[in-house]
């Protein structure tokens, strides 16, 4: 009996609403330092799990593949866990009607070393041998097969490749400087050759390092700031998206008090997209989440109003909503949590050059790889590339700094939104690591900036 038949036999024998899943996760890391390979490591986790639900309550059990535990046994364990929450779990009244939804891809990591070597050689050439280089190519593959007691199920595979670049040098005074950047794409490493903007990205990275050799100190204060598409996307994810996750709202996120209220200008719209944007499939396409709920777009901010939240089955029940398809689990042994998928602020109409010209004294924050926020929407981000803006022109690079603020105050302060828009892929580490993407335009706003 194949895996699907085993799953079908298990869910049909259960008296409760169930979902069973088989999952494989594979990671490979290849790192070069100044052209020499210093790491080539892979890891794999495989197993299966079962979930049983009664109303808003869930029982869960998982086991690694090497134990060869049956789905029936996992369902029994999940039912025992559910009974600790509900004395008399509801019986399933769904009729079993088979419907498969498959979205598959191949796990191909064969060319990772050759790809990262070619990228390293290109960087070394344009940097004229004057940059210390560390490049890591990271492959994230996940393959899932799942089935619900309703008969709906399928296979969903995803493969995303990340490129992490760290370049180092000495500034004019002999101090160490560096630039750290992250990019990524859907599919295997060889897809790097298909990305039109990869070489411009690499050239820009080398230029950022060169600019830092003659950088100037930041002037601390609340300033006019232009956030690039990449940095606006990071802000949207860290400071706005997390506050709109229903489990965080249940834990006290300020967004719970703002739902249905106007929080910013009508030209601001923020959506967590399930799988497509403007007719194109996204880097992290989610059609059904890890609870088997159909994924839909969530319009978090609509015309300046805090409009909707991201939910799983439990929080949807608590808030009287339909699950949005945001329940995601990193590995077979993880219970699904409310997670973002492809979160974006929609573009405006103004040219970025006109926005820069409108700033008399401020900063252009071009790139950064991480940030943190709390449930009040207060955040901190440490950029990797910042430039002065003086009299409407971009000036010198700025020494290491950080930006802080509250996302809702920042949204209120937005005075311009550019018409250019781009997507960026990354890793979200909310309890479990999952791949996400963020999309955004450039924005002009007010932010606190200070020394790092």
Task: Explain the meaning of each model-derived region.
Residues 1-452:
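N-terminal small-residue-enriched
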């Amino acid at each position: 009996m194949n895996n699907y038949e085993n799953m079908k036999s298990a869910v049909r024998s259960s008296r409760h609403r169930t979902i069973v899943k088989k999952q494989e996760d594979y990671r490979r890391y290849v790192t070069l330092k100044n052209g020499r390979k210093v790491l080539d490591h892979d890891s794999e986790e495989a197993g299966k799990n079962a979930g049983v639900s009664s109303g808003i309550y869930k029982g869960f059990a998982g086991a690694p593949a090497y134990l060869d535990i049956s789905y029936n046994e996992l369902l029994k364990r999940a039912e025992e866990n559910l009974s600790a929450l509900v004395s008399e779990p509801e019986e399933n009244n769904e009729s079993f009607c088979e419907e498969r939804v498959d979205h598959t891809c191949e796990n191909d990591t064969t060319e990772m070393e050759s790809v990262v070597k070619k990228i390293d050689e290109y960087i070394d050439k344009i940097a004229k041998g004057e940059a210390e280089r560390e490049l890591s190519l990271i492959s994230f593959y996940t393959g899932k097969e799942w089935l619900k007691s309703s008969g709906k199920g399928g296979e969903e595979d995803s493969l995303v490749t990340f490129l992490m670049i760290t370049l180092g040098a000495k500034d004019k005074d002999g101090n160490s400087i560096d630039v750290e950047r992250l990019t990524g794409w859907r599919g295997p490493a060889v897809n790097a050759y298909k990305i039109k903007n990869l070489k411009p990205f690499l050239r820009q990275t080398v230029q950022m390092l060169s600019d830092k050799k003659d950088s100037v100190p930041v002037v601390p204060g609340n300033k006019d700031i232009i956030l690039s598409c990449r940095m606006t996307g990071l802000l949207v994810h860290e400071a706005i998206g997390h506050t709109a996750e229903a489990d965080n709202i249940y834990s006290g996120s300020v967004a719970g008090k703002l739902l249905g209220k106007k929080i910013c200008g009508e030209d601001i719209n923020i959506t967590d997209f399930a799988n497509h944007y403007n007719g194109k499939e996204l880097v992290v396409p989610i059609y059904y989440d890890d609870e088997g709920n159909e994924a839909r777009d969530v319009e978090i901010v609509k015309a300046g109003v805090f409009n909707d939240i991201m939910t799983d089955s439990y929080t949807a029940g608590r808030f009287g909503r339909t699950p949005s398809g945001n329940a995601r689990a990193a590995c077979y042994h993880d219970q699904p949590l409310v997670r973002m998928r492809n979160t974006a602020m929609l573009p405006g109409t103004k040219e970025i050059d006109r926005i820069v010209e409108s700033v008399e004294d401020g900063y252009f924050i071009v790139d950064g790889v991480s940030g943190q926020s709390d449930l009040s929407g207060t955040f901190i981000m440490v950029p990797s590339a910042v430039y002065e803006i003086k009299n409407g022109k971009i000036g010198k690079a700025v020494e290491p700094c950080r930006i802080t603020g509250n996302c809702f105050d920042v949204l209120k302060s937005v005075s311009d939104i550019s018409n250019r828009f781009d997507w960026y892929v990354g890793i979200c580490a909310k309890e479990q690591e999952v791949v996400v993407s963020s999309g955004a335009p450039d924005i002009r706003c007010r932010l606190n900036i200070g020394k790092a």
